[in-house]
């Protein structure tokens, strides 16, 4: 069975095991924070397979996590914000995928992660960004998230910056992220198929890795309790910076 799994996923068993552990940890983070699953997988998984191959796998992981968390997301989310972000993201993903095909993958990811570090640092410094409270800020953030999703599958990090900038309860912020990622996953699938990124191997890898990711999500949800809600925003912003910085360092070292 193990050799068959290796052949099915076109990966050695050792790499499959490492990738499964990465997905478990990423799912744990997603279950608590409501985002960062794809970012965690991209930041670590690129040591095993290329970003272009990881993007469709991340789609399956995000969809699995969304199904586990959607009920709470629908009940507690700011639906206007989540839907607006999803609309913008839908328009942005094709641009990002086109850029991915046109420029070097490492360069595209370096640009995306650099933007994340800058914006997250600004928010940790408590600098107000009035633009994010406008309709243009809403749809613009969604569009940028779509582009970054196509570039490096870290669009959820951009949306997290927008949602965390709102003066809303932690539970609502987390739920809005969950709802956006579900809606965004539905529309992103169309672009992935259109660009030929979602092939049979990607589907099988995504389905297999959904099991450890789903287990991680369940464990992470158990950690999101009221007494820790005040830690939510600083934890998420610090997580954004850490993940993005890790990706940048890896890219620079491999250059």
Segments from the language model and where they lie:
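Cytoplasmic-side transmembrane-helix entry/capping segments in multi-pass membrane proteins
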Residues: 78-89, 109-113, 133-143, 172-179, ...
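Hydrophobic alpha-helical transmembrane segments in multi-pass integral membrane proteins
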Residues: 54, 105, 109, 148-155, ...
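Membrane helix-loop-helix hairpins that form the core translocation module of multi-pass transporters
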Residues: 51-125
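Residues within membrane-spanning alpha-helices of integral membrane proteins
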Residues: 16, 59, 112-116, 120, ...
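Small-residue-rich segments of transmembrane alpha-helices in multi-pass membrane proteins
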Residues: 43-52, 86-97, 119, 139-151, ...
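Small-residue-rich hydrophobic segments that form or flank transmembrane alpha-helices
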Residues: 2, 15-83, 142, 146, ...
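Transmembrane helix exit motif
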Residues: 2-4, 66-76, 97, 111-136, ...
């Amino acid at each position: 069975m193990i050799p068959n799994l290796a052949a099915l996923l076109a990966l050695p068993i050792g790499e499959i095991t490492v990738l499964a552990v990465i997905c478990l940890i990423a799912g744990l983070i997603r279950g608590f924070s409501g985002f960062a699953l794809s970012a965690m997988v991209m930041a670590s998984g690129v040591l095993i397979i290329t970003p272009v191959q990881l993007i469709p796998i991340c789609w399956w992981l995000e969809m699995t996590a969304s199904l586990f968390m959607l009920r709470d997301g629908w009940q507690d989310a700011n639906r206007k914000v989540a839907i607006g972000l999803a609309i913008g993201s839908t328009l942005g993903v094709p641009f990002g995928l086109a850029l991915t095909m046109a420029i070097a993958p490492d360069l595209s990811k370096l640009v995306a992660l650099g933007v994340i570090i800058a914006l997250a640092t600004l928010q940790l410094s408590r600098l107000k960004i009035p633009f994010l409270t406008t309709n243009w800020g809403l749809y613009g953030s969604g569009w940028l998230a779509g582009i970054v999703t196509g570039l490096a599958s870290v669009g959820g990090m951009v949306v997290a910056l927008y949602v965390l900038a709102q003066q809303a309860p932690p539970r609502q912020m987390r739920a809005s992220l969950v709802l956006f990622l579900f809606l965004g996953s539905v529309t992103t699938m169309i672009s992935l198929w259109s660009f030929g990124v979602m092939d049979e191997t990607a589907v099988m890898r995504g389905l297999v890795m959904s099991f450890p990711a789903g287990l991680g999500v369940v464990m992470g949800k158990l950690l999101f309790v009221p007494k820790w809600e005040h830690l939510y925003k600083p934890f998420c912003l610090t997580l954004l910076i850490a993940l993005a910085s890790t990706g940048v360092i890896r890219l620079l070292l491999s250059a």
